Amino acid sequence: MTGNLVTKNSLTPDVRNGIDFKIADLSLADFGRKELRIAEHEMPGLMSLRREYAEVQPLKGARISGSLHMTVQTAVLIETLTALGAEVRWASCNIFSTQDHAAAAVVVGPHGTPDEPKGVPVFAWKGETLEEYWWAAEQMLTWPDPDKPANMILDDGGDATMLVLRGMQYEKAGVVPPAEEDDPAEWKIFLNLLRTRFETDKDKWTKIAESVKGVTEETTTGVLRLYQFAAAGDLAFPAINVNDSVTKSKFDNKYGTRHSLIDGINRGTDALIGGKKVLICGYGDVGKGCAEAMKGQGARVSVTEIDPINALQAMMEGFDVVTVEEAIGDADIVVTATGNKDIIMLEHIKAMKDHAILGNIGHFDNEIDMAGLERSGATRVNVKPQVDLWTFGDTGRSIIVLSEGRLLNLGNATGHPSFVMSNSFANQTIAQIELWTKNDEYDNEVYRLPKHLDEKVARIHVEALGGHLTKLTKEQAEYLGVDVEGPYKPDHYRY
């Protein structure tokens, strides 16, 4: 037997050759391995770290629970972590972002077969329900030996961290609070999972929290959660904010989005972008990548912003700065990229053009009022996976919604390209090494990687692209007040 097809009613882990997992189809492993080998060539940061640390094995003893999009690029990250000595369990951080062949390749491993896998436990498949998503998250955090729980977390969006910290908080309170009637459906599912587990294990999450040495967080939304936990005094372990490393936020967030937004819209709709009116909600690093991508396709781009500095940047690049209410009725394509909630509400959706395209590229699905749309009485026709046509009976107008309001670049396409993810994942690997090997130097606060490590990641990728850096003379370095080998900029420098 080589397949392992997931069905809705099969939420128990599969076990083969001592590895527990739940993925779509193990027989996809060979395809996944071929793509993984190509990705390795495009990810010089991770491959350089493998070579640098192969003998030292700095992550030996680390049991990393990872919650991050289960893509081909993430597969290279996972196998980098294991190459440096870590044990790993994995789940995706989004119900639509898993690439099933990548998940299969990771479970089978480079030296296994579908019948005899020798890789890493993965609990992820494309098209999970929310119940399945949170089940998979719990499996990722539940190690086989209860005396050896997870001792590191690698997170994207903060769901794994939230599961542990909220679980511990409710265990200490002795009760999981009831959901309110108007709570989002996902929050109700989350609380139900914790309540069910509390009935059988009163201190599961407390034990995990006490074991974890630290968390490294990939994205803007997850970092916001970390700072909120820290401000409330609820952060139980040190955290490194990988997102705000320059070689992450200024590259993955902007240049990765510039590539993958167009890919997602093209695969989802095949609509011509040139000449169309496009509204980008938010002009942070992700929004800048979106606006630049659309402009490059010949679209007429407008931007919404709350921050006057970002708004002025947008205008200096030639974009109109408008409100949603001003622009929604004329827009052919609307993309949310704010990291905030309640950006495009039902009244906005109803005001959109017939067959306008609506999508989100922020981490969560609450930027677009999908719950309101579902309650509105509009009819939904699924055109193909992650593409839905919603039609309002009173007006007859239809709206094309991508990936149910979740990340369209991962739901409708394959996410950011390998080279830019090499920057981000090199930072993740370095951050894991930093927290694991120097844990006594960190308090339960949120930190950023030091500048010299950011520059190290950049240097690797400049060389991979054939660039040649100018070297300071000793006299020049003294004049600038820096070391010849860097760091070259103060921490407050904005690039």
Swiss-Prot record:
Pfam families listed in its UniProt record: AdoHcyase, AdoHcyase_NAD
Major subcellular location class: cytoplasm
Alphabetical keyword list: Cytoplasm, Hydrolase, NAD, One-carbon metabolism
EC number: 3.13.2.1
Family matches, as CDD domains: SAHH
Cofactor or coenzyme needed: NAD(+)
Co-factor note (free text): Binds 1 NAD(+) per subunit.
Family from the record: Belongs to the adenosylhomocysteinase family.
Job description of the protein: May play a key role in the regulation of the intracellular concentration of adenosylhomocysteine.
Name of this chain's protein: Adenosylhomocysteinase
